Amino acid sequence: MLELRSVTAGYDRRAPVVRGMGLTIEAGGSVGLLGPSGCGKSTLARVAALLHRPYAGEVVLDGVPVAGWRHHAPRAQRTAIGVVFQQPRLSADPRLRIADIIAEPLRATGRGADARSRTEELAQAVGLGGDLLGRRPHEVSDGQLQRACVARALVLRPRLLICDEMTAMLDASTTAALVGVVEEYRARSGAALLAVGHDRVLLERWCERTVAWPDLTAPSPR
């Protein structure tokens, strides 16, 4: 499903935060990436999500090497991945209503005709009442906004979900609810999961396999 091969990445070529990392996620599998804050795991997650071009190495999705990043990535690869970040207020457009945040990927890919029905379906799945869909981010809580961001990540029915510290800002009940939403989707769709975090207990309960950050320096299995 996803292979990261000897990836080196960062924000300064002279001091990359990710050096020669490898990771494999099988189709339908779930991997937890465990590491302390600042180690580079979120940068690696952005590479895996095709949002950050590495300096070196290769990303292979469904057996096809990735040749472009961000909006330059082929649509078939770009839309195969759904991403949820740690801070919803940094990843949601504050000008949009909650319903439009959820539907944003549909409209961006020319599928706006499905927006209303799909938004209502996913809002119910993540526990957002209909009265919240007309509000803007500043009118809802962090937990409610993160629910919307999870719905947005699922709206194109991705084959791979990347959850980068998705629950770090949430209370225990919201964490359990959103992990449940992700796992219900995976059970229905067969999607794979990369969950990134620093909470070993959560990752080991959530994922089939948990990999600690230093262990990624070893070559990824082929």
Where on the chain are the PLM-derived regions?
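ABC ATPase NBD coupling module
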Residues: 66-82, 96, 100, 108
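Conserved ABC transporter NBD signature motif
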Residues: 57-68
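Hydrophobic anchor residue at the start of the ABC signature
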Residues: 150
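Conserved catalytic motifs of ABC-family nucleotide-binding domains
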Residues: 157
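Conserved ABC ATPase signature
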Residues: 136-140, 144
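Helix-to-loop junction immediately C-terminal to a conserved catalytic motif
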Residues: 49
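Conserved ABC ATPase "signature" region
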Residues: 114-131
